[in-house]
Swiss-Prot record:
This is Subtilisin-like protease SBT4.13. The gene is SBT4.13. Residues 113-579 form the Peptidase S8 domain. Residues 31-108 form the Inhibitor I9 domain. Its EC number is 3.4.21.-. Residues 352-436 form the PA domain. It is found in: Secreted. Residues 25-109 form a propeptide. GO terms for cellular component: extracellular region. The C-terminal propeptide is autocleaved. One of its GO terms (molecular function) is serine-type endopeptidase activity. Keywords: Autocatalytic cleavage, Glycoprotein, Hydrolase, Protease, Secreted, Serine protease, Signal, Zymogen.
Length: 732
């Protein structure tokens, strides 16, 4: 396996050389790599001689001295040579040549998400190592892999004195000075048998591990946002799900154990009333004890009202792309290349395989349409075995191995996500899939090869993931959710060798690629921990505010509510800016109780949420929209009327004394809003001083298709404290 991994890594490097700038040019010639697939099995085949013959034929020169740069002849077949553009075109058409691409200067790759956000490795990023080492992240998930290099305690001292937890991970499970605590609520032991918990924990706080990859894909340094911090794992999930009672027990223990914040990449398909939501209840208790809870928004997008984790005392995270993605090319027998999506580590050794469309291999039990979608029991095994199965949808993933196919090509509705499969596979968007179908219908012997996945860079980003759950918030309609977005697409992080990289996958890996708001959530948890290392006495709401008000604005890339604040909240997280926000919106337990009273919750319900006996009075009750939240949102009763809505807010100075902030309003989308800020200038003489203001929004004839929005920015010339303002009329 080590040899295979090494050759796969080398091949992967060669296949991504077309991503950078050209490095070698001689006159009008430049160095190209001619990739020819696997080595010939013929005993009399000599690669270098073949390469020289090809060059002589293409160039018309008997002596090719200075032309041949390098022959690849041990693990695969190919060569590098100095060619003109016309020579490159000729060699690309020759039999046996898979692809020709320019030579480039390469740099070692990282897993990119933290670099993408500006939190770079080593001395490039300001750190507070002593405080970071005292920071404890509680991970409520499917457990953890203690042997992972991401959780090695090399260089770590003993746990912080505040730590009161235990290591009760079960048999053959040992904690250390990095992984300082483990608890199990499933009777299986805390060891991660799935991989999800290991992945999220390493994303938030994993050590920097060089040369990590998924069989050579994404090779580079994998690390968490706060590598010097400690981890405590709380296992609440099994393959059948995560029980409410286990979740609450984990919150209970984590808070008492002394964690500084909690990351929980768990949720429901839709939001629940707070009193019925174990995460909302647990997070309320965490907030009351000074512990921030970061929660995933859910993977039920792009449909509206699908976001979960909507309580204002939770930092709710959507998922978006980074500047790196993965593509898998499908080369058809006619030479045409289609670009698909998957994370395919398999190599088909340069060999084309026969293609068979599911509907052309229909079993007697189904019609051609069902077989075309490769539905269960609809494909005849005898007509598929040894071939690449083509399916009109992802249903083929369930049957492809059982019918004996050697690969799979399917139509995918998700253009932005690459998944791992247990055999060579690629998902094609409709246009490319139709090209594939046309090819299938044009020949009696269609063939293709699915190439190993390549990394692509500098794509448009960040873009909100299609799967990321959207608002509006149906439980607290005047609280904008999700709050923030972060990298959650094709994230490489530590994994459990006991888990499967994909369903029915027999491979065992230490690092894997996953997508979901489960992946974006620990990114924000890592940012929250990073912010806390510079501001250890900050409350959860101050950290949440800092993250939200310093976020990058996200440009709408689509239409409808799926591309509005209901998709990304305040924007894309910016770790460096969040560590020094200038001003924050601060909240405590009493503010949240006043908010709940304003939602007309009964004393009985309030006790369920807060654990305390609370009697609401007018003095304690506030309109939900007047909660001192970093974003501002209001749901109105109708779209055709003139309206006026106000928001009351208070800012706390956490920057410098004697600072003055001036307000500015930037228009968003939807109907035009008239926004007035009173007062429009705030002056702070001291640190921790508070100043209040009112936002008055007026307008008429609101757009009923999308929310209407604007952005309020307070600036002192150094800090820009931005809050989205959203007004809407329906649940869409």
């Amino acid at each position: 396996m080590a040899t295979l991994a090494a050759s796969s890594s080398l091949l992967s490097c060669l296949l991504v050389l077309f991503l950078s700038s050209v490095s070698a040019v001689t006159d009008d010639k430049q160095v190209y790599i001619v990739y020819m697939g696997s080595l010939s099995s013929r005993a009399d085949y000599t690669p270098t001689s073949d390469h020289m013959n090809i060059l002589q034929e293409v160039t018309g020169e008997s002596s090719i001295e200075g032309r041949l740069v390098r022959s690849y002849k041990r693990s695969f077949n190919g060569f590098a040579a100095r060619l003109t553009e016309s020579e490159r075109e000729r060699v690309a058409k020759m039999v046996g040549v898979v692809s020709v691409f320019p030579n480039k200067k390469l740099q070692l790759q990282t897993t990119t998400s933290w670099d993408f956000m500006g939190l770079k490795e080593g001395i490039k990023t300001k750190r507070n190592p002593t405080v970071e080492s005292d920071t404890i992240i509680g991970v409520i998930d499917s457990g953890i892999t203690p042997e992972s290099q991401s959780f090695s305690d090399k260089g770590f001292g003993p746990p912080p004195q505040k730590w009161k937890g235990v290591c009760s991970g079960g048999k053959n499970f040992t904690c250390n000075n990095k992984l300082i605590g483990a608890r199990d609520y499933t009777s299986e032991g805390t060891r991660d048998m799935d991989g999800h918990g290991t992945h999220t924990a390493s994303t938030a706080a994993g050590n920097a591990v060089v040369d990590a990859s998924f069989f050579g894909i994404g090779n580079g340094t994998v690390r968490g946002g706060v590598p010097a911090s400690r981890v405590a794992a709380y296992k609440v999930c099994t393959p059948t799900g995560c029980s409410s009672e286990a979740l609450l027990s984990a919150f209970d223990d984590a808070i008492a154990d002394g964690v500084d914040l909690i990351t929980i990449s768990i949720g429901d398909k839709t939001a629940s009333m707070f009193q019925n939501d174990p995460i909302a209840i647990g997070a309320f208790h965490a907030m009351a004890k000074g512990v921030l809870t970061v929660n995933s928004a859910g993977n039920s997008g792009p449909k509206p009202i699908s976001v979960s984790g909507v309580a204002p005392w939770i930092l709710t995270v959507a998922a978006s792309t980074t500047n790196r993605g993965f593509v898998t090319k499908v080369v058809l027998g006619n030479g045409k290349t289609l670009v698909g999506k998957s994370v395919n580590a398999y190599e088909m050794k340069g060999k084309d395989y026969p293609l068979v469309y599911g509907k052309s291999a229909a079993s007697s039990a189904c019609d051609a349409e069902s077989a075309g979608l490769c539905e269960l029991s609809c494909v005849d095994k005898s007509r598929v075995k040894g071939k690449i199965l083509v399916c009109g949808g992802p249903g083929g993933l369930k049957i492809v191995e059982s019918v004996g196919a050697v690969g799979l090509i399917y139509r995918t509705p998700k253009p932005d996500v690459a998944f791992i499969h247990p055999l060579p596979a690629a998902g094609l968007l409709t246009e490319d899939f139709e090209s594939l179908v046309s090819y299938l219908e044009s020949t009696d012997s269609p063939q293709a090869i699915v190439l190993k996945t390549e990394a692509i860079f500098n794509r448009t980003s960040p873009v909100i993931a299609s799967f990321s759950s959207r608002g509006p918030n149906t439980i607290a309609v005047d609280i904008l959710k999700p709050d923030i977005t972060a990298p959650g697409v094709e994230i490489l992080a530590a994994y459990s060798p006991a888990g499967e990289p994909s369903q029915d996958d027999t491979r065992h890996v230490k690092y894997s690629v996953l997508s979901g708001t489960s992946m974006s959530c620990p990114h924000v948890a890592g940012v929250a921990a990073y912010v806390k290392t510079f501001n250890p006495k900050w409350s959860p709401s101050m950290i949440q505010s800092a993250i939200m008000t310093t976020a990058w604005p996200v440009n709408a890339t689509g239409t409808g509510i799926a591309s509005t604040e209901f998709a990304y909240g305040s924007g894309h997280v910016d770790p460096i800016a969040a560590s020094n926000p200038g001003l924050v919106y601060e909240l405590d337990k009493s503010d949240h109780i006043a908010f709940l009273c304003g939602m007309n919750y009964t004393s009985q319900v309030l006790k369920v949420i807060s654990g305390e006996t609370v009697t609401c009075s007018e003095a304690k009750k506030i309109l939900p929209r007047n909660l001192n939240y970093p974003s501002m949102s209001a749901k109105l009763s109708g779209s055709g009327t003139t309206f006026t809505v106000t928001f009351n807010r208070t800012l706390t100075n956490v920057g410098t004394p004697n600072s003055t902030y001036t307000s500015k309003v930037v228009a968003g989308h939807g109907s035009k809003l008239d926004v007035k800020i009173t007062p429009s200038v705030l002056s702070f003489k001291t640190v921790n001083e508070k100043q209040s203001f009112t936002v008055t929004v007026t307008g008429s004839n609101l757009d009923s298709e999308v929310p209407s929005s604007a952005n309020l920015i307070w600036s002192d010339g150094t800090h820009n404290v931005r809050s989205p303002i959203v007004v809407y009329t329906s649940d869409y």
